[in-house]
């Protein structure tokens, strides 16, 4: 809902929104994205990782596809942070959003990366803090807690990837023993 709910709101405001159908394994391909892009497309927004099916999108490839069509690219990297390497610059993101609680940080804290010179209108008006991009008093404790949580998550990332991969492989093996049960998403063991 983090990406879909704002998309629905934009539709209610009169914007045209296209949804890309993922392939049977939950991945959005550049070809599928290209099929829904139109000359008037201004923004592409993709979840970097899906916590329900486990797919990690080819974010850099999707960003290149969006940029080639003249659109800005945003990723919701909340589910990816601390689980897979995240580098918004290498990915080519114009914007990326994160939430602290997914890496053990304080609830209510988050971060929005916006690439320098990316067009951006403030959603909160007032005192003009953050170069006019976000007014209001900053949650310093929340930001510090988020920073600490990211550091811990990055230090434990390789172990967490191995742990989650082992759990997934164990689940797939147990399900494979059940007659008539088959996974709806195919993931290579150890990935």
Language model feature labels by segment:
Residues 1-191:
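Pyridoxal 5′-phosphate
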